């Protein structure tokens, strides 16, 4: 098993207008592990002013596990599953579902979701923590902005055998048409200062420099290791999600542009409900939706941990898993029905590879993919493919879609 780094303490953040979430925890994907996640809305839309410990699930591969994915040349990657057709005025858009997982380091979860996606030719997105390509013994090769060398809130990649397994998973996923994005590196959030909210444009650029360095120079950063080829092109990493959803837009933007990123999915929606992504300063922003869940009896940011905290304050109570799984699944299906019969905005299902609260989230997410990704006029897709579809449309037709009111906001 990989070493885990325990974060001690809890930062309580009060937010009346914008709302802030901070969560923290530890260990592998069988229990909460990792560091805080902070969600700070960009606007004055109602947010989820809850505070609780959070954990990001890290890599969990065995030191003896063999790399499952075969290194496939990029040219052999399967084609997009999204029909690239232009709408005429008044046509109905396809219903896109965008499933994503922050961290993307668990071999077990990669294999589960790859298997779930295959029968319906579906796609999902893994936002990789760059440090999972850096062995524990080489951790001093990373220096987070404002932090000491070798420091991280989510640990590192474990052994080189585990990194080889992860490379196999990434290759397999990319060859099957799934998308690899960035979840940056050290996961420094409020309480692990300086956190992302304090970083300058130069800091974010340094963080991305190191992410792409780990991505492209994984052999040089793990000298002597027998590692397979990573066949995922670095220039296919087009966007991602910031650690803890932190960061100031004006500081992030120059770093994104300097590294060729074209989208982000870290900012709370400017209104309650599910809306179409918007292009802001040449970056497609896929807003984190703040939705109403009947089963939870209120509104919540549509992310696994937020739903857990809304349910029982983020307490590990596996005996409640059947109830919570049902609530999560019903929330997803209700939102699908509202978007499908409403504005057809892409439905974002934001998760982590985890077994929190008795596997209360990955199980219903997997079941939702199996049940809904193959429905008529519905495509579980990558961010980049949805962007390609949107940019194919006539500007006036696309604007009509983007201007539609939100759905899923509740009363």
Predicted feature descriptions by range:
Residues 4-9, 14-99, 108-114, 118-119, ...:
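N-terminal pre-catalytic segment of deacetylase/amide-hydrolase enzymes
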Residues 69-179, 186-190, 214, 218-247, ...:
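Active-site beta->alpha N-cap acidic-glycine motif
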Residues 80-82, 263-276, 329-411:
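C-terminal domain-boundary segment and adjacent tail
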Residues 110-111, 159-167, 204-209, 324-334, ...:
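Well-ordered, non-membrane alpha-helical segments in soluble/globular domains
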Residues 191-210, 251:
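Active-site cleft segment of glycoside hydrolase catalytic domains centered on the general acid/base Glu
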Residues 211-219, 260-263, 376:
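A generic secondary-structure signal for well-formed alpha-helical elements
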């Amino acid at each position: 098993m990989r070493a885990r780094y325990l974060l001690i303490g809890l930062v309580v953040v009060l937010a009346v207008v914008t709302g802030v979430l901070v969560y923290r925890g530890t260990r592998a994907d069988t229990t909460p592990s990792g560091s805080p996640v902070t969600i700070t809305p960009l606007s004055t839309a109602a947010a989820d002013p809850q505070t609780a410990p959070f954990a990001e699930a890290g890599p969990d591969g065995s030191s003896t596990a063999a790399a499952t994915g075969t290194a496939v040349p990029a040219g052999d990657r399967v084609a997009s599953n999204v029909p690239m057709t232009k709408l005429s005025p008044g046509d109905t858009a396809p219903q896109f579902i965008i499933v994503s997982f922050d961290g993307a380091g668990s071999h077990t979860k990669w294999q589960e979701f790859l298997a779930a996606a295959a029968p319906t030719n579906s796609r999902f997105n893994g936002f990789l923590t760059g440090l999972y390509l850096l062995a524990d013994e080489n951790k001093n090769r990373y220096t987070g902005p404002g932090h000491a060398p070798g420091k991280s809130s989510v640990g590192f990649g474990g052994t080189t055998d585990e990194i080889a397994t992860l490379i196999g998973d990434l290759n397999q996923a990319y060859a099957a048409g799934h998308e690899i994005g960035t979840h940056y590196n050290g996961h420094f959030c409020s309480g692990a200062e300086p956190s992302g909210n304090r970083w300058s444009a130069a800091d974010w650029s340094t963080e991305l420099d190191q992410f792409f360095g780990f991505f492209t120079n994984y052999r040089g950063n793990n000298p002597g290791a027998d590692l397979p080829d990573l066949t995922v092109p670095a220039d296919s990493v087009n966007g991602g999600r910031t650690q803890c959803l932190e960061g100031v837009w004006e500081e992030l933007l120059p770093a994104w542009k300097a590294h060729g990123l074209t989208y982000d999915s870290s900012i709370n929606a400017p209104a309650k409900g599910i809306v179409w992504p918007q292009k802001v300063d040449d970056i497609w922003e896929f807003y984190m939706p703040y939705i109403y869940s009947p089963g939870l009896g209120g509104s919540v940011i549509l992310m696994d941990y937020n739903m857990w905290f809304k349910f029982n304050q983020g307490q590990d109570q596996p005996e409640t898993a059947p109830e919570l799984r049902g609530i999560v699944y019903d929330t997803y299906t209700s939102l699908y029905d509202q978007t499908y019969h409403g504005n057809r905005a892409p439905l974002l299902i934001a998760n982590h590879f985890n077994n929190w609260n008795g596997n209360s989230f990955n199980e219903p997410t997997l079941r939702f993919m199996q049940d809904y990704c193959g429905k008529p006029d519905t495509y579980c897709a990558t961010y980049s493919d949805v962007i390609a579809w949107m940019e194919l449309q006539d500007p006036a037709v696309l604007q009509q879609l983007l201007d539609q009111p939100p759905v899923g906001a509740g009363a």
